[in-house]
Amino acid sequence: MTFKRALAFMLLAVTVLASFAACKTEEKPVEETTLDISGYTIVKPDITSNDITETISNFKKYLLSYTGAELKVSSDWYNPTQTLDESGYEILVGNTNRTVSADAAKELEATEDENSFIIKVTDNKIVILGKNDDTTRRALKYFLVNYAKTVEENSKTVNLKKGHSEIKTVTSDSIIFNNFTEFETILRSTVTAPESKWAIGTYEYPTMIQLRHNGKHNGTLLSTLESGDAGYRIMKSTDDGVTWKQIASVKDYLNNGYVTTWMPFLYELPVDIGDYKEGTIILAATSRNKSSDFDISTITLYVSTNQGRSWKTICNVDKAGGLSWGVWEPFLIYEESTERLYCFYSDDSDPKHDQKLVYKYTTDLKTWSELKECVACDDPALRPGMISIAKMSNGEYAMAFEMVGISGAPIYIKKTKNLDDWGPVSDYGQPVKTAEGITFGSAPWCNWTPAGGECGTLIVVGKHPVPYANTEEGAKMLISFDYGKTYVAIDNPIPYAIYSDSRCGYSPHLSFSEDGSILYYMNNPEYGVKYSCEYIELVKIKITGMDD
């Protein structure tokens, strides 16, 4: 009995130890935190807007860039005589005919907010659905930023797991484009305005710079504008545009008997030029003779070496006679490769052309080159004018100008890679318009920033819609993400009305922060009774691309 009892105890002990050993080595299954999407297809509704189709194409491109997964795109069409096969692995964008899309749509309908979207994952489907095209676009961007951009490169996965479901409400009032770039208005302020809304006066043609070459003063904003014959007001902001104060008034003391009247343009020297150090502020403008027939006009330069507090007149770039024979609308730009400062402007003085676009350049701010043409039309009645130029990252300069003499004074852009070579002067480039034909005319401005996409963002603004008619809406703002090959239109961030007695929208201005992420947009909407005068308004817009 003793031996049998001992053997029984030994067997029991072995069994218990084996049980403990089994408990110790048993492991729970690892929960998957990523989803392999390499075998998925992106599926969209058979009837889809062009905008969403383009957005899905960009979505596919970014998925490849972030995850390494190159997916096909197809529509949800199927032969109605056959049973719909829902067994495939699919990313469903929008309200497709798949069962899980319908289920997700019902969940989304339960939310009252129209700015909502849903992302839902089942065994073989990922649903990305918004209540409208705008929220679907935001849902796709949210998916990319939060679930695709966060994985290991070339992993062909996203940071999602089966069973995931979330509904989000968009809280931003930003504009989102098909390439997922967003424009968000972050500030509106008044730069300067009349003392009374019953006033009659001129508040137009604003330009602005953000100081970048003035040491501790960098970031300061300086602005100027047309304000009659009283001189060019210099407005200053040290809080990035929230508040403004006048610090100077610039007058012409070089040309005896001339008044400072029209078209001021501010520029900060990026390098030393002649006797003038990097950071010197230049104001270029048109002065005119006081005589009743305005018989002489000049392109005159003024400089400030103390951040705009005081000024002196240094030279005339050009001089010509009369309202019908004058020189107007100067624009300054420095070309690093040639170390030249260029002054582009409109010239009425050639009897062979009603008006043409010309330029001179200098390397010392004392002597200027001979006058050269960049646009001089074969039709002598045409009047190209109001130049602005933006340098883009592809090495091209884009020059925007109006073409008075064609109905509506439409805006054109001509390009070059060399400021001293614009090709045939009779070639005036391409019109600025969307694929739908949306365009504008008169008083253009263009500028470019690296923010917003692979090719950066080119922005063009003008005064009035084309075809032109008295309207309660000013011109749209046109945006290009491909160096000016194509454009999309958005509502003007500074709304204004256009009537025959209104000067609103003449002339808008675009500039950027040093890193390009902030757009400073200035214009002159109506202020007085019956549009007797305007005021200068600033809007700051934050530009955010997928990789910004």
State what each model feature region is.
Residues 10-18:
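Bacterial N-terminal signal peptides
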Residues 17-33:
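Sec-dependent signal peptide cleavage junction
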Residues 21, 108, 342-343:
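Secreted/extracellular small peptides and ectodomain modules produced from precursors
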Residues 1-10:
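Bacterial N-terminal signal peptides that target proteins for export
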Residues 177-548:
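Asp-box/BNR beta-propeller blade signature and adjacent active/binding-site loops
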